[in-house]
Regions:
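Low-complexity, polar/charged sequence tracts that form flexible coils or short amphipathic helices
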Residues: 10-11
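Extended hydrophobic/Leu-rich segments
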Residues: 143, 148-151, 160-163
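Extended lipid/amphipathic-ligand handling interfaces
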Residues: 2-4, 14-24, 30-35, 40-63, ...
Length: 173
C-alpha cells in the first residue's frame, strides 16, 4: 500500500494490490487506487507475447471506477472558473473491458457516465494496433446527453447567451 500528495494537488489515499510476473506473463488480480474523491479498480492478465511484433498471446483488462469532480478538474487543468463552478458535483462513472492482443483487440465494454449530463457506451474491435499504416477497427458508439449547461461556460461570458445545448443523441458505427 502507498500514499502520496503531489504539489499539483493530486492526493493518492491508497494504492493497493499485487501482481505476479514471470518471463512469459503478467497477472494483476486487483489493483485499487483511491483519492479523496475517486476510486478505480483494475484487473489485468497478459501474455507478454500479446504485445510482440507478431502478437500470439492474449491479454485482458477490466477497469471500474468513479472519478470525482476534484480529480476531473485537476487532470483537465486550467479551466475557466465559471466552468469549475458549474461542473456537476457528481463522479464520472467508468467501465472498460478489453480482450485480445495488438493484432486484434475486442472492446466489449466502454462506458462513461456523468449523472444528469451524459452517458457514453461503446464496443467494437480494433485490428493491427501497432501498425500506423494498416491500423483499422469498427466501433459502435451510443452517446446520450442531457443537461450540459455547465459546458457553456467554456465558451466565455460573451457567448453564454447565444449557446444552447439541448439533450442530444448520437449513434454511430
Amino acid at each position: 500500500e502507498t500514499h502520496m500528495k503531489e504539489k499539483s494537488g493530486l492526493e493518492i489515499r491508497s494504492l493497493t494490490g499485487h501482481f505476479n510476473m514471470d518471463s512469459t506473463s503478467l497477472h494483476v488480480p486487483e489493483l485499487v487506487l483511491r483519492t479523496p474523491d475517486s476510486y478505480i479498480r483494475t484487473q489485468a492478465d497478459m501474455d507478454l507475447s500479446a504485445v510482440a511484433e507478431q502478437p500470439q498471446g492474449k491479454m485482458s483488462a477490466r477497469l471500474m471506477g468513479e472519478l470525482g469532480k476534484q480529480d476531473v478538474l485537476l487532470f483537465a487543468g486550467g479551466l475557466p472558473p465559471a466552468f469549475v463552478k458549474a461542473y456537476p458535483n457528481s463522479p464520472v462513472i467508468l467501465r472498460l473491458s478489453a480482450d485480445g492482443n495488438l493484432d486484434t483487440l475486442n472492446l466489449t465494454t466502454v462506458e462513461a457516465r456523468l449523472a444528469g449530463a451524459f452517458e457514453l457506451k461503446a464496443d467494437g474491435k480494433m485490428f493491427r494496433l501497432a501498425d500506423s499504416v494498416r491500423r483499422s477497427g469498427h466501433v459502435n458508439l451510443n452517446l446520450r446527453t442531457r443537461n450540459l449547461d455547465f459546458a457553456r461556460a467554456l465558451a466565455g461570458e460573451e457567448a453564454l447567451k447565444d449557446i444552447a445545448l439541448p439533450p442530444m443523441r448520437l449513434d454511430g458505427n
